[in-house]
Amino acid sequence: MKRIRHITFLAAFICIIFVIYAIYHSVGQADSSVFAGGEGTKENPYLIETAAHLDNVRNYLGEGYHFQLVQDIDLTAYLDPGGPGWEPIGDNANRFEGHINGNGYRITGFFINRTDGNYIGLFGVIGENGLVRNLSLTGDYITVEGAPALVGALTGNNYGVIDNVSVEIGDGITLSPQSAYVGGLVGTNHGEIWNSNVNSDVNGGNEVGGLVGRNASNNTTRIGIIHNSHATGNVSGQDMVGGLVGNASGKIRYSYATGNVDGLESVGGLIGTSVRIEVDASYATSDVTGESSVGGLIGDVRIDNSRSSVRNSFAIGKVTLPSTGGDVGGLIGTNFSGDVENSYAAGQIEASGASNVGGLIGRQAGGFSSGTVENSFYDEDTTGQSDTGKGTPMSTADMKDRSTFEDAGWDFDWIWGIESDDYPHHDLYFTLTYQADDLDHGDVPSDEIHSRGSVVLVADQGNMSRTGYSFSGWNTALDGSGETYDPYSPVFNSFVMGANDKTLYAQWSINKYDVHFDGNDYDSGQAPLTETILYESEVNVPDQHTLVKDGYTFTGWNTERDGSGDFYEPGDTFRMGTEPVTLYAQWEINVYSVSFESNGGSQVSEVEAEYGTAITEPLPPEKEGHLFKGWYQDELLTEAWDFETSKVSENMILYAKWEINEYTVSFESNGGSQVSEVEAEYGSSITEPVPPEKEGHSFKGWYQDEFLTEAWDFKTDTVSGDMTLYAKWEINVYSVSFESNGGSQVSEVDTEFASLIEEPTPPEKEGHSFKGWYQDKLLTEAWEFETDTVIGDMTLYAKWEINVYTVSFATNGGSKVSEVDAEFASLIAEPTPPEKEGHSFKEWYQDELLTEAWEFERTRLTKI
C-alpha cells in the first residue's frame, strides 16, 4: 500500500506540472502541414499517413478532434534505435479525448525503452471522451526500468473506449518486479475494451495481465468493461497475475486467455485477483503456476460487500503450485465472495503441498460474504481431485456428455455447444457481415465475430466512399427498410448480437452541395443567392444579377477566381459534382480610347488602354514657336494628366498645353558699336534698335544671315527662334588733299577708310628739298604711306627744307677766296676781293663770260 500511495502522489505531481500544457492544447484548427488533410471533424477527420502525422496528434488532445489513418505507418526510421523510443501521446494531466480510427491499418516499428516513468504506451492516458478503434499495433519491445506504473502497449490508462485493436510486441513487454498495473494492451482500464486482442508476452511486477493490468471499478460512474477480447501471450509477474487481467473489477464477458501464466500470489489463467467482478462466458486454456491462490481461471475472488459472479465460464489448463501452502483450484484458487454458476474446470492440477486444493475451487471461504457454487463441475480424472461442496466432480466421459450439463440447466441454445468426445465450449459467436454496394473507393469493414448477447458497436465508415453520397449508417435491409444503426450516434451505434449471423448494409444519402456566387472584386450590387443542389442535378447558370465592377464588363462565371477553371455563360448548365462549387464572376477589363488634341501641334496618335491602367506618355508633339507643357484632362487646361499615377477610366481626350517661346535676338554689329540683345515672343516683331556706329563705315541695316543677303524688315519680319541679326556696313570713301606749301600742285585722291594711299610724285619747290607729307600743318606728324591708313577726309601737308648752296669764288688767276655756304634766296656777304698781280679786281660775275654782275647787296642766291 505504501508503494501505491507513492505512485498516486507522483501522478498528482505530474498533473500539476503539466496543467499549463492542457490550456494551450484545447480544440483548435491544425495547420495544413501537420496532417495529410482533413479538418479534424467527425465528417472530415485529420488524415494520418506518416509517423510525423501520428506524432502530431499529441498537440491535438482535446475533445472533438477526429483522426483517421489512411495507410500503414512504420515508425522504424522515425524512432532512434538507441533512444527511448516512442513518447506516449498525452499523460494524466493532458488526456487524449479525441477519436482515432485506425481504419484497419497497422502501426509498425513501435518500441519503448525508458529508464522510468508512468503512463506508458502509444498513448499515455485515453480520457473519458476518447475512442481508439480499428487499429493494429506491432513492435519490437517495451521495457521500462525502475518502478513504473500504468504501462500498456496502447495506453497506460484508459477511461474511454477501445474497439477492435490488436497488439503484437515481438519481444514482449518486460518490466521490473517493482512495476505495477502492467497490461499487454492497457495498464489500467476504467473504460471499455471491445473486440480487442494481444499476442505478446508480458512480464512485470504486481497487477500484470496479458490484456489489462487492472480492470477498475469504483462502484459509481466508471466500470471497467472487457468484452469479446483475448490475450494469447505468456504472462509472468509477482502478485495478481492473470492471463487476461491481473486485478479485475467490473465486467468481463466473452473473453479468453491462452498463454501460460506464472506468478507468486493470486495467479489465474484469466484473472489474477478480483473483487466486484462479473465474469460471463469467458475461459482460459492457460497453464498456470503460482505459490498462493492459484486458479485455472481466477486466482482469488476477494471479500467485498458487493458480490462477484462467474457464469458460463471454464478453464482447461494445467494448474501448478510447486511450494507448500496456499490454495489451488481448477477454476478458482480462493473464493471469498464469488457466485459460481454453470462453469467447469478440466485441467491437470499439481499441488501436492497446497493447503487447500479443489478440482473446481481450492478454498471456498465461509462467513457473511462466502462464495457459492451452482451447477458447476470439474473433471475428476484430469484434475486428480474428488472434493465436493465446492463443485461437482465428474468423470471425463460425463464431462463430455451433453446431458450432464443439460440436466443441470445449462443453455445449449444460446451459450453452450458440445461436440462428441469433447468438453462443452461456448457456442456464442456469430458473424457480423458488412456489405456496401456501389463503392467508388475504400474497403468494406471486415467480417466480425461476436458472442451471442454481446453489445456490438457497429463499424464506422472507415475509408469507404461513394461519389456524391454521404455515409448515413447501416441497415439490416438493403433498401433501408430494416433496423438502422449510426456509428456516430451515442444512442444508435450498437445492438445486442443475437443467435444468428447478421448482415448490415451500408446506407447512403445523396449529397447536396452549395453553388456559391462570388462577385470577384466587384464594386457594387449583389451576387445571385447561393443555391443548394443535389449531386448530379443540373445547375442553371444565372446572369450577373446586380453585380457591377467599375471599368469592367461581366462575361460569365468561372470555377476559378483567375478564370483558369471551367467557364460558364449565363444560361449554360452543368451537372453538380461532389464538392461545393464557387462560381466567380468573370470580368473583362474595358478598353478605352485616349485621343490627343495637340491644339495646333503635330498630330499624336490615339492609344487604347485598359481601365485602371496608366498609359505611356507619347512623344511630345511639336508646335513652332511653342514649348510643350504637358497633357491636360480638360479643354481649359486646369487639370494635368500624370502619366505615372493617373489611370484611364473612360474614353477621353487629353489636351496639349503650350507655352509660347520667348527668344533672344542678338545683334552682331560686325565691328560696330555694341547693340544690346532683346527678348521677343515667337511671331512678334521687334523694335529697331539705335543703329550702331563703326569708324569709317556707314551702317546699311540689319541682316538675318552672316552673308548679309537677307535684310531684316523690322516692320514685317517676326521672330521664330533664337537668332542673331548681322549689321551691314558700307566702307566710307574719303578725299585726301595735298597741300604742297608752295610747291608744285599735287592732285587730291579718293580712298576707302583704313586703306593705304599711294604716295604721289613729290611736288617741287624752287630752292627747296621735299621732305615728305605731314598730317598737320605744323608738320609734326609725318604720314607713312606704307603703314598709315585713311580714316577720314584729310589734307596732307608738304614739308620743305630750304636748300643750302655752296658759293665758290673763281678768282680767275687771282688770290684764293674761300667758298661760302648760303641758303637759297639769301644774300651773301661780299668777300675780301682777291688780288691778282698786275690786275685790278673789278667785281664778281655770275657767269664765266662776266656779263652779269653779282650784286651782293641785292642779288639773292637762287642757283649755283
Curated annotation (Swiss-Prot):
Descriptive protein name: Putative Gly-rich membrane protein Bcell_0380
Record Pfam families: Flg_new, Glug
Residue stretches in coiled coil: none
Topology within the bilayer: Single-pass membrane protein
Main location as per UniProt: membrane
InterPro entries reported in the protein's UniProt record: GLUG, InlB-like_B-rpt, Listeria/Bacterioides_rpt_sf
Example of a GO cellular component annotation carried by this entry: plasma membrane
Keywords of the record: Cell membrane, Membrane, Transmembrane, Transmembrane helix
Entry's transmembrane regions: 7-27
The keyword Transmembrane helix appears for this protein: yes
Species the sequence originates in: Evansella cellulosilytica (strain ATCC 21833 / DSM 2522 / FERM P-1141 / JCM 9156 / N-4) (Bacillus cellulosilyticus)
Record field: compositional bias (Polar residues): 383-395
Keyword Membrane assigned: yes
Annotated region (Disordered), positions in chain: 372-399
Localisation per UniProt entry: Cell membrane
